[in-house]
Amino acid sequence: MTLSKNSHKEDQLEEKVLVVNRCSKVVKGGRKFSFSALILVGDGKGRLGCGFAKANELTDAIRKGGEAARKNLITIETLDGDSIPHEVLVDQDGAQLLLKPAKPGTGIVAGSRIRLILEMAGIKNIVAKSLGSNNPMNQVKAAFKALLSLSSRKDVLQRRRVTHD
């Protein structure tokens, strides 16, 4: 059996269930339950993805969420794979997130959801503060927006059309 390059890369991704939600609908025969799941995948080296899915069975919701997360992979700019290059503050649907770079040895100082996202992204030293909404979906969206807005020194110099070594 031969594995393609894509399937080999996906095998390195770690999958975590961030939130599971159960909804009920009252029908003639009783209650009918459905589930939604928010799934996070990452390799700890700068690749990260998030997926949200709904299904009538919990296992199906988790599986579909994992597939959606693998389709939405992003790559994150870090400083030597350790911290972020600069401070960033983002607003997303009522949730605010502040990310600050930290010195080596600080670790990840953040709430549980944001900590999990940063660990799976491979960031080791960072300070994060979540403000506003505590909705998990909004916090995850804010974290992804913040991580996508990061730019390296090289990118900034290139945008300014400055050549520097």
From Swiss-Prot:
Residues 13-76 form the S5 DRBM domain. PANTHER family: MITOCHONDRIAL RIBOSOMAL PROTEIN S5 (PTHR48277:SF1). The N-terminal domain interacts with the head of the 30S subunit; the C-terminal domain interacts with the body and contacts protein S4. The interaction surface between S4 and S5 is involved in control of translational fidelity. InterPro entries: Ribosomal_Su5_D2-typ_SF, Ribosomal_uS5, Ribosomal_uS5_bac-type, Ribosomal_uS5_C, Ribosomal_uS5_N, Ribosomal_uS5_N_CS, Ribsml_uS5_D2-typ_fold_subgr. The keyword Ribosomal protein applies. With S4 and S12 plays an important role in translational accuracy. One of its GO terms (cellular component) is small ribosomal subunit. Belongs to the universal ribosomal protein uS5 family. Transmembrane segments: none annotated. GO terms for molecular function: rRNA binding; structural constituent of ribosome. The lineage of its organism: Bacteria, Pseudomonadati, Chlamydiota, Chlamydiia, Chlamydiales. It comes from the Bacteria. One of its GO terms (biological process) is translation. Part of the 30S ribosomal subunit. Contacts proteins S4 and S8. It comes from Chlamydia felis (strain Fe/C-56) (Chlamydophila felis). Keywords: Ribonucleoprotein, Ribosomal protein, RNA-binding, rRNA-binding. This is Small ribosomal subunit protein uS5.
